[in-house]
Amino acid sequence: MLKKIGILTSGGDSQGMNAAIAGVIKTAHAKGLETYIIRDGYLGLINNWIEVVDNNFADSIMLLGGTVIGSARLPEFKDPEVQKKAVDILKKQEIAALVVIGGDGSYQGAQRLTELGINCIALPGTIDNDITSSDYTIGFDTAINIVVEAIDRLRDTMQSHNRCSIVEVMGHACGDIALYAGIAGGADIISINEAALSETEIADRVAMLHQAQKRSVIVVVSEMIYPDVHKLAKLVESKSGYITRATVLGHTQRGGNPTAMDRYRAFQMAQFAVEQIIAGVGGLAIGNQGDQIIARPIMEALSIPRSSRKEIWAKFDQLNQNIYQKS
């Protein structure tokens, strides 16, 4: 009979992870189950950094950014011997089920543990929104709000000084942060991984905006496209006539209090995860589709192709080009 549930967060942190942790703890305790936190992800698991917690632990964490139980990356977890050690530790603690919050790598670890006898449920915790089995990942909403606020602030000062700002945002190989925040922030040019503009194209477009006498320009780009955005800024400046500066937002996108939407989604998914565990089901990835919380086998979730954002990007890009070409 199931008596104990474990929780770990793995990989890069994201806002809303603590709301998911709180959701697991509160739901499990309401069902009469003990909850155990595992410090620092899979690294903590193989080192037996496991602690029992109660509802008091969950009471004040939903508003906090990051993950209060810590996270770490552990490439060695792919090793079958390391996986076996993790299973042995969980079984010794009589923890028969685990909620894993993280990205693709965390999902793969959860799948392997499920195959070895520990029922695992995975929740999509990453600001990048690159878990294809879920419309939105935990932390994405907060991240794009942070980026929009940064764009707003940069626009103020660029407008004051008649300048151009290039803003590089996170996303790994997914352009959703740049696309969503760029559109919401009123960017003039957006370059994402699947619709990447060349450095020369960006410089030429900024030059056209200068010719159209636009007072300020905001360019939003995804990371991992351009080797050095500061050098890109120098190129843009040399070709456009604008003094141009680059801002790399970096890890500011992963910190701070989660938005209401991230807390809400994370808590809902956590509740659903515990319900699946109580039903005796493991090896599932939880996500959202529209307003619905859904579950899929982890391996199926990992195999879903990413939906293209090219059409959304193209409509926005064409609209902006029409505006400044007619100016």
From Swiss-Prot:
Reactions listed under catalytic activity: beta-D-fructose 6-phosphate + ATP = beta-D-fructose 1,6-bisphosphate + ADP + H(+)
Gene: pfkA
Residues given in the record as ADP binding sites: 155, 186-188, 214-216
Catalytic activity, EC: 2.7.1.11
Required cofactor names: Mg(2+)
Cellular localisation: Cytoplasm
Keywords, alphabetical: Allosteric enzyme, ATP-binding, Cytoplasm, Glycolysis, Kinase, Magnesium, Metal-binding, Nucleotide-binding, Transferase
Positions of substrate binding: 126-128, 163, 170-172, 223, 245, 251-254
GO CC, any one term: 6-phosphofructokinase complex
Source superkingdom: Bacteria
GO MF term list: 6-phosphofructokinase activity; AMP binding; ATP binding; fructose-6-phosphate binding; identical protein binding; metal ion binding; monosaccharide binding
Ligand binding (Mg(2+)): 104
Activity regulation info: Allosterically activated by ADP and other diphosphonucleosides, and allosterically inhibited by phosphoenolpyruvate.
Gene3D superfamilies: 3.40.50.450, Phosphofructokinase domain
Pfam family, one: PFK
Classification via HAMAP family: Phosphofructokinase_I_B1
Subunit and interaction comment: Homotetramer.
Pathway where it operates: Carbohydrate degradation; glycolysis; D-glyceraldehyde 3-phosphate and glycerone phosphate from D-glucose: step 3/4
Keyword DNA repair carried by entry: no
A single GO BP: canonical glycolysis
Enzyme class: transferase
Active site: 128
Record's function text: Catalyzes the phosphorylation of D-fructose 6-phosphate to fructose 1,6-bisphosphate by ATP, the first committing step of glycolysis.
Family: Belongs to the phosphofructokinase type A (PFKA) family. ATP-dependent PFK group I subfamily. Prokaryotic clade 'B1' sub-subfamily.
UniProt-annotated binding residues for ATP: 12, 73-74, 103-106
Protein name: ATP-dependent 6-phosphofructokinase
